[in-house]
Amino acid sequence: MDFSAYQNLWVFIETDDGKAASVGLELLHPGVELAHQLGQKAVAVILGKDNTEAEKAAIAYGADQVISVEDPAYEYYNTEAYTYGMTKLVEKYQPSILMIGATIIGRDFGPRLSCRLKTGLTADCTSLAVDAETGIMGWTRPAFGGNLMATIMCENTRPQMGTVRPGVFKKTAPDNTRTAEVIKESIPVPADVIRTTLIESIREAAAEMVKLEDAEIIVSGGRGLGKAENFSYIRDLADALGGAVGASRAAVDAGWIPHVHQVGQTGKTVAPKLYIACGISGAIQHQAGMSGSDCIVAINKDPDAPIFSIADYGIVGDLFQVLPVMTAEVKKLKS
């Protein structure tokens, strides 16, 4: 089939209160590289009520062009409204590739949009590659419970769509001196399209929010903790450091901590400045979710644990003795 009319790589920039969410800016990093390999543009696409800040951020993080749709209907994410607006844009501009963050919103938006466009979608990707000759994208994602990595291609329809996990790619350093074309589109949403309405938005208390993808410090616990109650050791150190609490799949499968804390191929992919792995053996599935961390500290009583092979610093010892000392020292330094 001839897809020569389909050009450019689009990155959907999710917003919150008019500000660009981190995942969209992360995706501009590979998006720009892949688009330029094809000799095409990396286009940031934004739907919202007031996109001024998000437009500036997208340009600073590398977008060659921005398509911005502003309307009160897009102030908050709405499945029907966003699908309607993006469908109109895709039909008009015909992008070859469309990348969406695999957030709660992206996991709802991506499948519905791909269905509307009658094209394929690869979900929860952790790696991307493109064939410069054919323009075909290779979307790689975990399969069979994270035991295999599958690369999926969409050869017969366009656009090629995929959702990509937050934290897989790091944002480039922003360049606030960059300029790029901003195309303003007006796409009002017909009343009969909207079947659901946001009545009230309630934000969780900051202390209860788990933002592993945005955390600069993560303290994670694994099977070595032995039971749910022992996650208090992890929380104490995380609180002292001002970090977030993570966990291995083994700890989550044991029911010691909710899945939202899981790091790894079947959990979240993170890249904090500091990652402390406590009682985690370091299976390849876990490493895939945190190996991009700037500094990795491993604490395990088994000197042959695989986690030590990727750790910058290793402590061979009993975590129940090590963690209280670390927590006390951190508190002492802070005081």
Indicate residue ranges for each PLM-predicted region.
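N-terminal glycine-rich FAD/FM-binding segment characteristic of electron-transfer flavoproteins
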Residues: 1-335
